[in-house]
From Swiss-Prot:
It holds the Pfam family ARID. Transmembrane segments: none annotated. This is AT-rich interactive domain-containing protein 3B. The lineage of its organism: Eukaryota, Metazoa, Chordata, Craniata, Vertebrata. Its main location: nucleus. Residues 203-365 are annotated as: Interaction with RB1. The modification Asymmetric dimethylarginine is found at R361.
Length: 561
C-alpha cells in the first residue's frame, strides 16, 4: 500500500507544477513591464528638461558635479537606463527559475521588492536633479541591488573632480593665461600636462622665474611679455634652460637693451658681458649663439614693439655680416711675406704651407743641400767655392755686397696688392652671385700667389753670396770692386744675369730647375730649351773662349753654380 501512496503523491505534485509555472512567468512579465514603463517615463523626463544640460556646461569651477546621467546626451541616457534595467532583471530571472516549491506569495514578494527598489532609485535621482547637494550621497550610497550604477557614478565623480582641479589651480595665475588657453585648446588647457610630471615642472619653472629676485619691475615685465606673446600668436609655453638653470628672460632683456639692442650686441660682439651679467659659467660652448637664438625667439619681437631699437632687416644684415667675417680669410702682409726662419721651420716640420716660398736647392752655395743639413743660415759663408772644370785650382775674388735689384719694385708690388685686395673685398660685399664670387676669388688668389712667389724670390736673391771665387789670378779688393753682378727678371720662371769681370761682360738667362740651377757661358748661341744658356760677351777678350775642361791663360768662362 505504501508504494501506491507514494506514486499517487508524486503524480499529484507533477500535476501541480504545470499550474505553478505559468503563474511564475506571469509575475516576471508583469515585473519587467513595470520596470520598463518606469524607465521610459524617467528617460522621457530627461529629454524634456534641456536646462539641466546647460546648467552642467555653465556651472562654476567650484560647484559639485551633478549626477552621471546629467552629463550625457538624452539618447545616451535612455540607452544607459535600458541597459541597467536589463542587467538588473537578468539575475532575478535566474533566481526565479530555481524556485520550484515556493508559491505565488513568494513571487509576489519578490516583485514588490524590485518595484520598491526601482522606485527608490528613481526617487533619489529625481531629488538629485532638484537639489545638487544630494548628488554626492546618491553616488556614494546607491540603491540596493544596483552595484554597477554606484561604480560608474564614482568614476564619473573622480573624472569631474580631476577636470575641475586644474581650473582651480590656475585661478591664481593671470586671467589672460586661462582665458586664452581655453579658447585655443577648447577648454582643456592643462589637462594633458596635469596627467604627468611635465606640467608640474613647467609650472615650477614659471614660478621660479617670478621669484629669482625682488625687483618690483620683474612681475610687471613678465606679465606684459606673456600677454604680448600670447596676443602675437606665439605663446611662451616653457621657460628656456641654459647651463642647467632657468634663463632669466627679464635680466637678459634688461642687459641687451641697456647695451643698445640685439643688433648692437651682434655688431660689437660683446656677448661675454651679457654672459657675465647673467651669472652663467664662462666655460659654456657657443654661449653667444645660444643667447642670440633664445633672445630672438622670446624677446626680440617684444624689443621691437616696445623700444624699436632695430628692425628685422637690420638684424638679418648683422647676422650675415657676422657670418661673412667669420669665414673671410685674413689678407695681410704676413701671409705673403717671406721669412727664411719660418720657411726653414716649416720645411723641417714637414707641414706644407699655403704660400710657402719656392724651394730652390743650392747645394754648392750652401743655401740648402739635398740632405737638408745646412738650412739654418740663408747666407753663404765666405768659404763657399765655385767649380771650374774638373779639378782645377781655385782662387777667391770678392764681389759687391748687394745685387742690383730695383728697390721701387717691392713698393709698387705692395701698392698693387693692396689695391687688388680692396677691389676684391668690394666685389665680395656687393652681392654678386656665388659662382662669380668663387671664380673671381680663385683668380685673385692665383694672381696674388704669383706675386708672392716673385717677391719672395727677390727677397731670397738679396741674400745670395757675398763673394764669388773665380779660377785664375787673384785680384785685390780695389780691382775686385770693379766687378759687378746685375740681376733682373723677365718673367716668373727666368732671370737675366750679367757678370762683368776684367772688362768682359758675361750675360745669360737662368731658368728655374728643381735639383740644381746651372749657369753655362760659352761660344754657343743662346738656347731657350736648355737649363741655362748664355749670350756672347759684349767685350770679348782677344783670346777665344775655351771649352769645358780646357785650361787657358785667360780667366775661365765656363761656370757652374
Amino acid at each position: 500500500m505504501e508504494p501506491l501512496q507514494q506514486q499517487q503523491q508524486q503524480q499529484q505534485q507533477q500535476q501541480k507544477q504545470p499550474h505553478l509555472a505559468p503563474l511564475q512567468m506571469d509575475a516576471r512579465e508583469k515585473q519587467g513591464q513595470q520596470m520598463r514603463e518606469a524607465q521610459f517615463l524617467y528617460a522621457q523626463k530627461l529629454v524634456t528638461q534641456p536646462t539641466l544640460l546647460s546648467a552642467t556646461a555653465g556651472r562654476p569651477s567650484g560647484s559639485t558635479p551633478l549626477g552621471p546621467l546629467a552629463r550625457v546626451p538624452p539618447t545616451a541616457a535612455v540607452a544607459q537606463v535600458f541597459e541597467r534595467g536589463n542587467m538588473n532583471s537578468e539575475p532575478e530571472e535566474e533566481d526565479g527559475g530555481l524556485e520550484d516549491e515556493d508559491g505565488d506569495d513568494e513571487v509576489a514578494e519578490v516583485a514588490e521588492k524590485e518595484t520598491q527598489a526601482a522606485s527608490k532609485y528613481f526617487h533619489v535621482q529625481k531629488v538629485a536633479r532638484q537639489d545638487p547637494r544630494v548628488a554626492p550621497m546618491s553616488n556614494l550610497l546607491p540603491a540596493p541591488g544596483l552595484p554597477p550604477h554606484g561604480q560608474q557614478a564614482k568614476e564619473d565623480h573622480t573624472k569631474d573632480a580631476s577636470k575641475a582641479s586644474p581650473s582651480v589651480s590656475t585661478a591664481g595665475q593671470p586671467n589672460w593665461n586661462l582665458d586664452e588657453q581655453l579658447k585655443q585648446n577648447g577648454g582643456l588647457a592643462w589637462s594633458d600636462d596635469a596627467d604627468g610630471g611635465r606640467g608640474r615642472e613647467i609650472s615650477r619653472d614659471f614660478a621660479k622665474l617670478y621669484e629669482l629676485d625682488g625687483d618690483p619691475e620683474r612681475k610687471e615685465f613678465l606679465d606684459d611679455l606673456f600677454v604680448f606673446m600670447q596676443k602675437r600668436g606665439t605663446p611662451i609655453n616653457r621657460i628656456p634652460i641654459m647651463a642647467k638653470q632657468i634663463l632669466d628672460l627679464y635680466m637678459l632683456y634688461k642687459l641687451v637693451t641697456e647695451k643698445g639692442g640685439l643688433v648692437e650686441i651682434i655688431n660689437k660682439k660683446i656677448w661675454r658681458e651679457i654672459t657675465k651679467g647673467l651669472n652663467l659659467p664662462t666655460s659654456i660652448t657657443s654661449a653667444a649663439f645660444t643667447l642670440r637664438t633664445q633672445y630672438m625667439k622670446y624677446l626680440y619681437a617684444y624689443e621691437c614693439e616696445k623700444k624699436a631699437l632695430s628692425s628685422p632687416a637690420e638684424l638679418q644684415a648683422a647676422i650675415d655680416g657676422n657670418r661673412r667675417e667669420g669665414r673671410r680669410p685674413s689678407y695681410s702682409s704676413s701671409l705673403f711675406g717671406y721669412s727664411p726662419a719660418a720657411a726653414t721651420a716649416a720645411a723641417a716640420a714637414g707641414a706644407p704651407a699655403l704660400l710657402s716660398p719656392p724651394k730652390i736647392r743650392f747645394p754648392i752655395l750652401g743655401l740648402g743641400s739635398s740632405s737638408g743639413t745646412n738650412t739654418s743660415s740663408p747666407r753663404i759663408s765666405p768659404a763657399t767655392t765655385l767649380r771650374k772644370g774638373d779639378g782645377a785650382p781655385v782662387t777667391t775674388v770678392p764681389v759687391p755686397n748687394r745685387l742690383a735689384v730695383p728697390v721701387t719694385l717691392a713698393s709698387q708690388q705692395a701698392g698693387t696688392r693692396t689695391a687688388a685686395l680692396e677691389q676684391l673685398r668690394e666685389r665680395l660685399e656687393s652681392g654678386e652671385p656665388a659662382e662669380k664670387k668663387a671664380s673671381r676669388l680663385s683668380e685673385e688668389e692665383q694672381r696674388l700667389v704669383q706675386q708672392a712667389f716673385q717677391r719672395n724670390f727677390f727677397s731670397m736673391a738679396r741674400q745670395l753670396p757675398m763673394k764669388i771665387r773665380i779660377n785664375g789670378r787673384a785680384e785685390d779688393r780695389a780691382e775686385a770692386s770693379a766687378a759687378a753682378l746685375n740681376l733682373t727678371t723677365s718673367s716668373i720662371g727666368s732671370i737675366n744675369m750679367s757678370v762683368d769681370i776684367d772688362g768682359t761682360t758675361y750675360a745669360g738667362v737662368l731658368f728655374a730647375q728643381k735639383p740644381v740651377v746651372h749657369l753655362i757661358t760659352g761660344s754657343a748661341p743662346q738656347s731657350l730649351g736648355s737649363s741655362a744658356s748664355s749670350s756672347s760677351s759684349s767685350h770679348c777678350s782677344p783670346s777665344p773662349t775655351s771649352s769645358r775642361g780646357t785650361p787657358s791663360a785667360e780667366p775661365s768662362t765656363s761656370w757652374s753654380l
